[in-house]
Amino acid sequence: MRATLAIALTLATTSPAFAAGGGWNLGNTDFVVILAFLLFIGILLAAKVPSLIGKQLDNRADSIKSELEEARALREEAQTLLASYERKQQDVQAQAERIVANARDEAAAAAEQAKADLAASIARRLTAAEEQIASAEASAVKEVRDRAITIAVEVADQVISKQMTAADANKLIDAAIQDVEAKLH
């Protein structure tokens, strides 16, 4: 097919060269250029340059296709990684929200516990203060009674010493001694 095309082109281009006159004249530059061109095309065809160029173009097209496929695969992998990282980021965000919610709940529970502990501490201190007040009252009442008894004894001593004679005092002492002897034996 290529050979037929080359011959047809040669015949089509040589007729204007012959029309210029003179036949096969090398002085005609158009004819020389056509011959050089045909010789160049013939050499290219003989060396199978078109098939080599075709192979190189096919190889380059194949390498471009493989690069495109590799780029497409890398893009899909990147999209998969991006989706994976987005899911992980959402999971981390949800976990952080759970941690914050748990911390808030624990803080609220700790605050409630602190309130309860404070109320219990206040109640204990109030009870201790009431007990101290009751003890102080009892101590004050005892001191007042003891003082009243002491004063009463002193007053009674003064009254008895003013009203009692020595004979009456001796009778009371003897009676007290007999009473003690009776209780001891």
Swiss-Prot record:
<keyword id="KW-1003">Cell membrane</keyword>
<dbReference type="GO" id="GO:0005886">
    <property type="term" value="C:plasma membrane"/>
</dbReference>
<dbReference type="GO" id="GO:0046933">
    <property type="term" value="F:proton-transporting ATP synthase activity, rotational mechanism"/>
</dbReference>
<keyword id="KW-0375">Hydrogen ion transport</keyword>
<dbReference type="InterPro" id="IPR050059">
    <property type="entry name" value="ATP_synthase_B_chain"/>
</dbReference>
<dbReference type="GO" id="GO:0045259">
    <property type="term" value="C:proton-transporting ATP synthase complex"/>
</dbReference>
<keyword id="KW-0812">Transmembrane</keyword>
<comment type="function">
    <text>F(1)F(0) ATP synthase produces ATP from ADP in the presence of a proton or sodium gradient. F-type ATPases consist of two structural domains, F(1) containing the extramembraneous catalytic core and F(0) containing the membrane proton channel, linked together by a central stalk and a peripheral stalk. During catalysis, ATP synthesis in the catalytic domain of F(1) is coupled via a rotary mechanism of the central stalk subunits to proton translocation.</text>
</comment>
<keyword id="KW-0472">Membrane</keyword>
<dbReference type="InterPro" id="IPR002146">
    <property type="entry name" value="ATP_synth_b/b'su_bac/chlpt"/>
</dbReference>
<comment type="function">
    <text>Component of the F(0) channel, it forms part of the peripheral stalk, linking F(1) to F(0).</text>
</comment>
<dbReference type="Pfam" id="PF00430">
    <property type="entry name" value="ATP-synt_B"/>
</dbReference>
<comment type="similarity">
    <text>Belongs to the ATPase B chain family.</text>
</comment>
<keyword id="KW-0406">Ion transport</keyword>
<keyword id="KW-0138">CF(0)</keyword>
<keyword id="KW-0066">ATP synthesis</keyword>
<protein>
    <recommendedName>
        <fullName>ATP synthase subunit b 1</fullName>
    </recommendedName>
</protein>
<keyword id="KW-0813">Transport</keyword>
<dbReference type="GO" id="GO:0046961">
    <property type="term" value="F:proton-transporting ATPase activity, rotational mechanism"/>
</dbReference>
<keyword id="KW-1133">Transmembrane helix</keyword>
<keyword id="KW-0997">Cell inner membrane</keyword>
<comment type="subunit">
    <text>F-type ATPases have 2 components, F(1) - the catalytic core - and F(0) - the membrane proton channel. F(1) has five subunits: alpha(3), beta(3), gamma(1), delta(1), epsilon(1). F(0) has three main subunits: a(1), b(2) and c(10-14). The alpha and beta chains form an alternating ring which encloses part of the gamma chain. F(1) is attached to F(0) by a central stalk formed by the gamma and epsilon chains, while a peripheral stalk is formed by the delta and b chains.</text>
</comment>
<feature type="transmembrane region" description="Helical">
    <location>
        <begin position="4"/>
        <end position="24"/>
    </location>
</feature>
